[in-house]
Amino acid sequence: MFNRLFRVCFLAALIMAFTLPNSVYAQKPIFKEVSVHDPSIIETNGTFYVFGSHLASAKSNDLMQWQQLTTSVSNDNPLIPNVYEELKETFEWAQSDTLWAADVTQLADGKYYMYYNACRGDSPRSAMGVAVADNIEGPYKNKGIFLKSGMEGTSSDGTPYDATKHPNVVDPHTFFDKDGKLWMVYGSYSGGIFILEMNPKTGFPLPGQGYGKKLLGGNHSRIEGPYVLYNPDTQYYYLYLSYGGLDATGGYNIRVARSKKPDGPYYDAEGNPMLDVRGKGGTFFDDRSIEPYGVKLMGSYTFETENEKGTGYVSPGHNSAYYDEKTGRSYLIFHTRFPGRGEEHEVRVHQLFMNKDGWPVAAPYRYAGETLKEVKQKDITGTYKLIQHGKDISADIKQTINIQLNKNHTISGEMTGTWRKTGKNTADITLAGKKYNGVFLRQWDSVREKNVMTFSVLNTSGEAVWGSK
């Protein structure tokens, strides 16, 4: 009887040992998609919200399953009911019937402050203001415009408006620094990216700043969508930016620079001052002058191979970012288009990790609840699909090449080099003589519907490389 019972228990334990990993680690995550262009994230009461252009918004409890709340500017939109009357001055000034990228923050009074903006589109004629609500889902009531651009004559800083030097007043992001001061970074193309110190009680800029302090850009260089996130572990402020054009052929890509102070100066991984980054005088959209600068986290790519359908993005950009103080995890939230789908776009979230040089690297696949855990060498070795994001601003979609990470720590295949696991999950990789560092991470591949080993690494030139086994 005892022997029979022992055999039954042993067999049950053996079955569990072989089946449990599949149920735990290969369970298919559930995603629900939404479309919010230029998503700016805020967390409140355990729920994540994103607000974007055209008064679009969505919410999620887990950053994976999203619920669309609003989609377009109309008088029926519950965020700002009767919006064309409520923001009449804004629409009239901008000569527009829509709104651009919004940002929402909560101030000490518990109220939610929505920074809205409208732009004519073919010129930097724009207006920016703030509306306030007791509930994050609205209704928001207008408190007024505080910045205008694109005017003929005197600008907000008291000098004649010059579109090569002065900002286009769109794409705001408000944030608190580590000392509790409130700031707003903003700007798109035209004269560049600027920052203002804000009144934390009123939500308006402190007086006497004009357009504020310039951080980078100018001469109509294609830089926009600024977003600042402080990381208490590295004690740096990270300024995220989008370079290029937002459409499927515009070469949109996500970059980052950092500073020890919220208002700069900001530098890239090579130590270049971002204040000097701009197009040449007398030019429009001079991408060649700006593309060497800033750490490029991702651009257009596909993990597609010869024998299987892959996954990829086209013109990912206009991101926000979130740091979870409880877990210490960071996330990159952005919109993206997709190969073969034209101008359709959806929100995506990728986890961020800091490499040993204090720069963020983005997980190759979308966030599916994964955590950074210890990995073993035997799980790392094998054949990988490799993406090199480079530094260019281009409509080209980066394609994969194949490499092998061998047991003897060499790399062979279409590129050669070396690799080493330097900690529980940290990666040192050399490819074609360039040194990269970052992380090894097991992630969910939604095309093959299984967990795979990946790596995300960055070199000192600010070039990101991803691998997927």
Swiss-Prot record:
The record marks 318 as: Important for substrate recognition. Keywords: Calcium, Carbohydrate metabolism, Glycosidase, Hydrolase, Metal-binding, Secreted, Signal. Induction: Repressed by glucose, and induced by pectin and arabinan. One of its GO terms (molecular function) is metal ion binding. Its cofactor is Ca(2+). Pathway: Glycan metabolism; L-arabinan degradation. One of its GO terms (biological process) is arabinan catabolic process. Binds 1 Ca(2+) ion per subunit. The record marks 171 as: Important for catalytic activity, responsible for pKa modulation of the active site Glu and correct orientation of both the proton donor and substrate. The active site is at 38 (proton acceptor), 224 (proton donor). Changing residue 171 to A: Loss of arabinanase activity. Disruption phenotype: No visible phenotype. Double mutant abn2/abnA induce an almost complete loss of this activity. GO terms for cellular component: extracellular region. Optimum temperature is 50 degrees Celsius. It remains fully active after 30 minutes of preincubation at 50 degrees Celsius, however, after preincubation at 60 degrees Celsius, the residual activity is only 15%. It catalyses: Endohydrolysis of (1->5)-alpha-arabinofuranosidic linkages in (1->5)-arabinans. Homodimer. Involved in the degradation of arabinan and is a key enzyme in the complete degradation of the plant cell wall. Catalyzes the internal cleavage of alpha-(1->5)-L-arabinofuranosyl residues of the alpha-1,5-L-arabinan to produce arabino-oligosaccharides and L-arabinose. It is also active toward linear branched sugar beet arabinan, and pectin from apple. This is Extracellular endo-alpha-(1->5)-L-arabinanase 2.
